[in-house]
Curated annotation (Swiss-Prot):
Membrane-spanning residues: 16-36, 59-80, 91-115
GO biological process: aerobic electron transport chain; aerobic respiration; cytochrome complex assembly; tricarboxylic acid cycle
Cofactor(s) the protein needs: heme
GO cellular component terms, semicolon-separated: membrane; plasma membrane
Quaternary structure, from the entry: Part of an enzyme complex containing four subunits: a flavoprotein, an iron-sulfur protein, plus two membrane-anchoring proteins, SdhC and SdhD. The complex can form homotrimers.
Positions in the Periplasmic compartment: 37-58
Species in which this protein is naturally found: Escherichia coli (strain K12)
Cofactor note: The heme is bound between the two transmembrane subunits.
Protein name: Succinate dehydrogenase hydrophobic membrane anchor subunit
Cytoplasmic topological intervals: 1-15, 81-90
Length: 115
């Protein structure tokens, strides 16, 4: 078995399970947000702040952000591995994507817990 240091999971089955699990988390988060928008009536700044003042909403939002990170990394790794053959270019693109995803999650963490 070939081990790849840039893959997130231990093997293809592990990646498959991670992608499915993160998809479920993201689907539940979308349902949660749609439910909020459908039941909140008029959406004002105070309502929005009140919604994100809840610890459950903050934790669920961060879980969704981490799920996006994992889901996107596995998907982009698979696409780059399949279609970008020059090693240097593939590693550079992987680095750029990882940095962008990590910055995205850190920024999301700051925004969510800054409310």
């Amino acid at each position: 078995m070939v081990s790849n240091a840039s893959a997130l999971g231990r093997n293809g089955v592990h990646d498959f399970i991670l992608v499915r699990a993160t998809a479920i988390v993201l689907t539940l988060y979308i349902i949660y947000m749609v439910g909020f928008f459908a039941t909140s009536g008029e959406l004002t700044y105070e309502v929005w702040i009140g919604f994100f003042a809840s610890a459950f909403t903050k934790v669920f939002t961060l879980l969704a952000l981490f799920s996006i990170l994992i889901h996107a990394w596995i998907g982009m790794w698979q696409v780059l591995t399949d279609y970008v053959k020059p090693l240097a270019l593939r590693l550079m693109l992987q680095l750029v994507i990882v940095v962008a995803l990590v910055v995205y999650v850190i920024y999301g963490f700051v925004v969510v817990w800054g409310v």
